[in-house]
A protein has these predicted regions:
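Amphipathic alpha-helical segments that line or abut small-molecule/effector binding pockets
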Residues: 91-106, 110, 157, 165, ...
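Alpha-helical structural segments
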Residues: 23-31, 35, 49, 66-86, ...
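Helix-turn-helix
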Residues: 32-65
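C-terminal peripheral helix-coil segments that are non-catalytic and often amphipathic
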Residues: 1-5, 161, 169-192
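Amphipathic alpha-helical packing segments from all-alpha helical-bundle domains
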Residues: 119-145, 150-157, 161
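Basic, helix-initiating cap at the start of DNA-binding domains
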Residues: 1-36
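Amphipathic alpha-helical segments used for helix-helix packing
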Residues: 102-129
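Short, hydrophobic secondary-structure boundary micro-motifs
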Residues: 41-42, 113-115, 179
């Protein structure tokens, strides 16, 4: 095996180990956020939970806030990709879009429940609202020929807050309804 092939294999192993370590750290932070706010969480607690030393933690993150921001950024990258992949078909296939959205929420329910919960990051919700606003509000104003943009902003705030509340309730009641069922419920509420 040539030196470059050995290096490529080592990089793959390192990448897998890094991914595993970050996944364990993410899980530990999620568990701790169920119990207390980020301000009370120490790097030592996270490191102890996943049986690593603090130095390993600091190879990946500056502190717990940097870690939380990094995790949130990953979610927003997923959301942006999600919106860009579905933006053209949103009207024709809203049910498909919402099913995909609720499926994503279910797959990441532990983390999203914590982020939307009492110990979560309030700026996460604000970033989520702003992202949807940037993606949808201006397009909707033009598309629906809105004359009173201020009134439409109130409508938007009302709808987004309601959607977030609906998602919170679903997550907090252990997602009894399927993503398909939740998509139908949300679509009915938005159309009324």
């Amino acid at each position: 095996m040539s030196t470059s092939n050995v290096e490529a294999v080592e990089v793959k192993k390192e990448d897998r180990r890094v991914r595993k370590t970050k996944r364990l750290l993410r899980s530990a932070l999620t568990d701790l956020l169920k119990e207390k706010p980020i301000q009370e969480i120490k790097v030592r607690e996270i490191a102890d939970m996943v049986d690593i030393n603090r130095g390993t933690f600091y190879q990946h993150y500056r502190d717990v806030y940097d870690m939380l921001n990094s995790i949130e950024d990953e979610i927003f990258i997923d959301f942006r990709t999600f919106f860009s992949n579905n933006s053209d078909s949103l009207e024709e296939e809203a049910d498909h879009f919402f099913i995909s959205l609720f499926t994503y929420m279910k797959e990441n329910s532990e983390l999203i429940t914590v982020l939307l919960g009492p110990n979560g990051d309030p700026s996460f919700i604000e970033r989520l609202e702003n992202m949807v606003r940037d993606k949808c509000l201006n397009e909707w104003i033009v598309k629906y020929n809105v004359v009173n943009s201020k009134e439409f902003e109130y409508y938007y705030a009302f709808m987004v807050t309601g959607c977030i509340g609906l998602i919170r309730l679903w997550l907090n009641t252990e997602m009894v309804e399927s993503p398909e069922e939740m998509a139908r419920i949300l679509e009915r509420f938005l159309i009324r």
